Amino acid sequence: MRKILALILAFVAVPAFADHPGDRLDEVMEQKEPAFKAVDLGTVPSLELLGPDGASYDLDSLSDQVIVLSFVPADCGAPCAEQQALLAKVRDGVNSSPMLSMVTFLIVSDAEDPAFGATAENIVVVRPKTLIKTPIEEYRALSPDAPDAPLVHIIARGNRHAGIFEGALFRQINMILYVNGLTNEH
C-alpha cells in the first residue's frame, strides 16, 4: 500500500513541480479543496500539553517542523474516528516520502488509552493540561464558520498557523500536497 501511495505521490508531484503554486499555495488549495480554509496567522493559540512521558510538551520544540494538529476528545466518536482514519492515509503518504523528517502529526486527546493506528517516529499523542474543550474552542475560533466536524490545523515552520482541513471530507492527496508545499517554504 505504501509503495502504491508513493507512486501516486511521485506521479502527482512531478506535474505539481511544473506548476508549483509557491506563494499562492493557500489560494490554489482553497480552489482545489472545498474542505480547506487558509487561516494564515503569525502564531498559534498556546497549548498547555503533557507529552507521552507525562512531562510538559511545548509546541516550540517543533518550530522546525510542519505540524498536522488534530484534537480527539474521548467522547467524539465516529467523526473523530473517520478523521483519524483519513489522517492515517495522509501519514502513510507523508511517511513514504522525504517529508517524514519534516512533518509531525500531533494528536491531542483526553482518552484514557488512545490508539490511533500504526505508530511512527513523527506521530506524537499528547494530553491537554486542562479540559480538552478549552483548546478545541480556542482553535475552532480561528474558523468560526466551520461546521461542527473536527478540524485539522496545519501549522507551518516557525509555529505559523497556515490552514484548516474540516472533518473527513477532504481528499488525502490535497492535504499531502499542501503539507509538501509548506515543507518547501523558505
Give the positions of each predicted feature.
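N-terminal targeting signals for export/organelle localization
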Residues: 1-50, 185-186
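Short loop/turn microsegments at loop-to-beta-strand junctions
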Residues: 44-45, 67, 149-151
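Short active-site neighborhood of thiol/selenol oxidoreductases, capturing the structured segment around
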Residues: 57-87
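Solvent-exposed coil/turn segments that connect beta secondary-structure elements
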Residues: 62-64, 73-74, 108-112, 128-130, ...
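Sec/Tat-exported extracytoplasmic proteins
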Residues: 66, 72, 91-98, 136-143, ...
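Structural microenvironment flanking redox-active thiols in thiol-disulfide oxidoreductases
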Residues: 82-135
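Structural micro-motif
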Residues: 121-123, 133, 137-153
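Thiol-/selenol-based redox modules, centered on thioredoxin-like
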Residues: 146-186
